[in-house]
Regions:
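Acceptor/aglycone-binding surface of glycosyltransferases and processive sugar-polymer synthases
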Residues: 49, 58-64, 68-78, 83, ...
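A conserved acidic beta->alpha catalytic loop
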Residues: 36-45, 91
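Short, well-formed alpha-helical segments that are part of the catalytic scaffolds
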Residues: 8-23
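Short helix-capping segments at alpha-helix termini
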Residues: 23-28, 50-56
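Acidic helix N-cap motif at the loop->helix transition within catalytic regions
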Residues: 10-14, 41-50
Length: 173
C-alpha cells in the first residue's frame, strides 16, 4: 500500500493501524510504504517510529515537498509486492474497498483496478469550484472524461514495473 503523506501527523498512526488490521484480518500479506513528502510537522518522526516497530511498515523521506506524484513514484519504486494500492493517508477513500480491489485483481485477469468516489463529501466550496473547473478544462482539452479519475487504485506488479521503467516522473495519477 503506497501512502503519500504531507503534513499528516494526525493521520499516519491511524492509517497504519486501520489498514494493517484490515489486511491482517483478511489474510493478505502486505507492506505499508509511507512516503513523507517534505512535511513541516512530525509526520516523518511518526513514520520512522512506526517503521522501527513494525516490519510491515516502510518509510521514505523527502528533504522537501516534491508533490504527490513524486511521492507515489517513490513508493512504487520501494514497494516489493505483487500489486500496489495507492491510498491517501487521510483515509478519504474507505480502506475496506482495498479488499474488494484485491479480490477483483486476484480473481480476474486485470492489471489495474480503479477506485472511484460516489460523492465528493464535505469540502471547501472554493476548492470544489476550482476542482470542478479544472476537470471541465481537462475533459474539454483532452476529449476524455477525467472527472471520475482517481489515484485510489490497485496496480499489478507488471504495471508497477512498466511505470518504474519510464523516465517520465511528472505524470498525473
Amino acid at each position: 500500500i503506497i501512502i503519500p503523506s504531507y503534513n499528516e501527523e494526525g493521520n499516519v498512526a491511524k492509517c497504519a493501524s486501520v489498514v494493517s488490521k484490515l489486511l491482517s484480518e483478511n489474510g493478505i500479506d502486505y507492506e505499508l510504504v509511507f512516503v513523507n513528502d517534505g512535511s513541516k510537522d512530525r509526520t516523518w518522526d511518526i513514520i520512522s517510529n512506526l517503521a522501527r516497530n513494525d516490519k510491515h511498515i516502510v518509510g521514505v523521506n523527502f528533504s522537501r515537498n516534491f508533490g504527490k506524484e513524486s511521492a507515489i513514484f517513490a513508493g512504487l519504486e520501494t514497494a516489493k509486492g505483487d500489486a500496489c494500492v495507492l491510498l491517501d493517508c487521510d483515509l478519504q477513500f474507505p480502506p475496506e474497498v482495498i479488499i474488494e480491489m484485491y479480490n477483483i485483481w486476484k480473481n480476474n485477469d486485470v492489471d489495474i483496478v480503479e477506485g472511484r468516489k460516489n460523492s465528493r463529501g464535505k469540502e471547501n466550496p472554493v476548492y470544489k469550484f476550482f476542482s470542478l473547473w479544472f476537470y471541465k478544462m481537462i475533459n474539454k482539452s483532452s476529449g476524455l472524461d477525467m472527472e471520475a479519475a482517481s489515484d485510489f487504485k490497485l496496480l499489478d506488479r507488471a504495471v508497477v514495473d512498466s511505470l518504474n521503467a519510464m523516465p517520465e516522473r511528472l505524470t498525473f495519477f
